[in-house]
Amino acid sequence: MTPHAPATVRRTALAVSTALITALPVLAASGSSAGAAAPAGPAATAPVATVDVPAARAGKKKNKKKGTQKYHHRAKVGAQVLRAIVLDQAPGVEGDKVVDLRIGRAAANINTRKASKAVSTSKTLGGRGLADTDLSGLLTGMVAKAGPEKGKEEVPSQTLVPVPAAPLLTLGVSTGETKARWNGPRTCVPGGKTVTSSSSSTADLAVLPGVIPGFGALLGLDGTVSATQKTAYLPKKRKAGLKAVATTGLADLGLFGDMVSIEVVSDPKMVATATGRPGKAKITYTPAVLEITGPDGSPVPIPTDGAPAEIGIPANPLLGLTIQFPGIINEKVSENGRLAKAKSVTLRLVVTLGGVTIADVAVAPLQTKVKVPKGGITC
């Protein structure tokens, strides 16, 4: 026997032991007796088929889930004429709650995980804690829903007759319309058509009219103002992106019965896009261009970096007014191109009386958000 024979014997014994160990699970699964273990060659292939069947099914489920993940996407968009928070210290406003008025809002949500995939709304007036004032005639909202099957829902333009709501506000004729469209499961609305669109407009708006004697409305907009939103897909070869647009159409503003006037030269607009490709998500914001004239008839310079500016009211030294141009106040864009979201406020007005804040007004707040899968939407 050569010096290498012992190693050869050990390898042979190991090979036999391995064959027996491999065969044992097959015998147990088939119920065969130990005497049937001799033909281990053919039986050794059985565990492969037995074990891999569930694994193959799990793989199919995983692939199916992965395919769904390549489709799921969502968007959120909103445009509003203004939001006014009036504190209970305001003269003439009774009740111990803060008044939160949301005037002229157009909004939408797209979420492929929901039963209603696309929801579009238009609302003339919303809010909470309305100081026990009856605003039921103004609280109108229009909603259009679409999905999961192919189809669309549209609420045509409706007109609201003016209803006085003193001492909080007055509104002229208001209108609204909304539409939502869906193209069916795992598909996208083609051809750049809007998935959602809505608008809300009102005329001759006055917030807290006559609340301070001799000064007219705290804030007035003479003319028609509006808020608009829309969403759509961005076709690109085989995979789509998503876009959301929010904008407002403002009228010139007057504060304290036009003691301070704000001329609107151009309106604000925000667009969010996401494609799922690196570097291809973005927020495009076009700020409003405003010109402000103070009580003495002189132009009022307002810092463009969002810093506040104080404006004195000589006719009533107890009144204080702070004006800001916040612009973009919250923005996030992912480097992988999957997410783009932002919020903005065109103009913020804080009014004090005797050092106490009585109103905080945000003019033309906008928000957009879009999120898509990596590489874009497979539809």
Show which residues each predicted segment covers.
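Secretory targeting and sorting signals
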Residues: 1-40
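Extended, solvent-exposed, non-transmembrane regions
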Residues: 37-379
